[in-house]
């Protein structure tokens, strides 16, 4: 199965560009989802040529300029810190195209989210104001959601991207749910990656990834800028008191539909008044 918890790499890959996370088909059990996290110093440039993958570039912190052909999106990004809890700007780029990202502020943190390019689509700026915002859950199961690329969006061919905030003392991705069977309309098959940040940064959260038969069952203490791979199974997150959690989810599979199945042992939680 491979290691599900990924610690920061912090590798310098170009002048002023640091690779923090790199998840791909070659180093993980995933077939549909890829993820990179890069940090750029002011003026530094990251370049990439896409082949059979599409990419959503998310300006996590700082301001960046994204260029693809004649399309230039200058000084996008809305936050100095993800825990400002406001939506940010993103750019979608289809397969077979080359792009570059340049940092316009002293530092910029950028997420690169990948999935198979099933058809050619226009390069698109996804403004912060385009994100739909949801407050989900109740009791100790509350979270704030920013939908960047939900399944109702026609911007991408296979990619789903969402940001989730969970306050201390709460659980999210909870009751535990999974989406690892191509069994629509009951359930869709979507792989998933989690990129985590924690406030304050010295904190940690817990994430469990498990299947019904427990053939896969890993519980991880996840720290700031760690990533977690979810090739299958349920994947709840618990946040200790005193710390806030942020994570960026990337999902993809054979069909661009998010339909999950709750763990029947814990679904009763939803039935409370």
Swiss-Prot record:
Q: Which family does it belong to?
A: Belongs to the isomerase IolB family.
EC number(s) of the enzyme? 5.3.1.30
Which one of the record's GO molecular function terms can you name? 5-deoxy-D-glucuronate isomerase activity
Q: What InterPro entries does this protein's entry cite?
A: Deoxy-glucuronate_isom_IolB (IPR024203), IolB_Bacilli (IPR023770), KduI/IolB_isomerase (IPR021120), RmlC-like_jellyroll (IPR014710), RmlC_Cupin_sf (IPR011051)
Recorded catalytic reaction(s): these are: 5-deoxy-D-glucuronate = 5-dehydro-2-deoxy-D-gluconate
Tagged with keyword Nucleus:
no
Pathway(s) where this gene product acts: Polyol metabolism; myo-inositol degradation into acetyl-CoA; acetyl-CoA from myo-inositol: step 4/7
An example of a Pfam family matching this protein is KduI
Q: What does this protein do?
A: Involved in the isomerization of 5-deoxy-glucuronate (5DG) to 5-dehydro-2-deoxy-D-gluconate (DKG or 2-deoxy-5-keto-D-gluconate).
Keywords (alphabetical) are: Isomerase
From which domain of life does this come? Answer: Bacteria
State any GO BP term from the record. Answer: inositol catabolic process
* Protein name (database record): 5-deoxy-glucuronate isomerase
The record ties this protein, via PANTHER family, to: 5-DEOXY-GLUCURONATE ISOMERASE
């Amino acid at each position: 199965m491979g290691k599900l918890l990924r610690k920061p790499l912090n590798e310098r890959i170009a002048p002023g560009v640091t690779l923090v996370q790199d998840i791909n088909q070659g180093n993980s059990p995933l077939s549909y989802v890829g993820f990179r996290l890069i940090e750029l110093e002011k003026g530094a440039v990251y370049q990439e040529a896409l082949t059979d993958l599409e990419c959503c570039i998310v300006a996590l912190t700082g301001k960046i300029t994204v260029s693809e052909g004649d399309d230039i999106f200058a000084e996008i990004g809305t936050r100095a810190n993800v825990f400002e809890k406001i939506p940010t700007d993103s750019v979608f780029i289809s397969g077979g195209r080359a792009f570059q990202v340049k940092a316009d502020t002293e530092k910029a943190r950028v997420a690169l989210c990948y999935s198979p390019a099933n058809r050619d689509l226009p390069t698109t700026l996804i403004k912060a104001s385009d994100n739909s915002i949801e407050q989900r859950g109740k009791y100790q199961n509350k979270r704030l959601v920013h939908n960047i690329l939900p399944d109702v969006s026609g911007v991408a061919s296979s990619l789903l991207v969402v940001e989730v905030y969970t306050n201390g003392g709460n659980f999210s991705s909870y009751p535990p749910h999974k989406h690892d069977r191509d069994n629509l309309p009951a359930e869709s098959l979507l792989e998933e990656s989690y990129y985590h940040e924690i406030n304050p940064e010295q904190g940690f959260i817990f994430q469990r990834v498990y299947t019904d038969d427990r053939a896969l069952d890993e519980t991880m203490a996840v720290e700031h800028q760690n990533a977690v791979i979810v090739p299958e199974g349920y994947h709840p997150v618990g946040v200790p008191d005193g710390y806030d959690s942020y994570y960026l989810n990337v999902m993809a599979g054979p069909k661009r539909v998010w339909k999950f199945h709750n763990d029947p042992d814990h679904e009763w939680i939803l039935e409370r008044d």
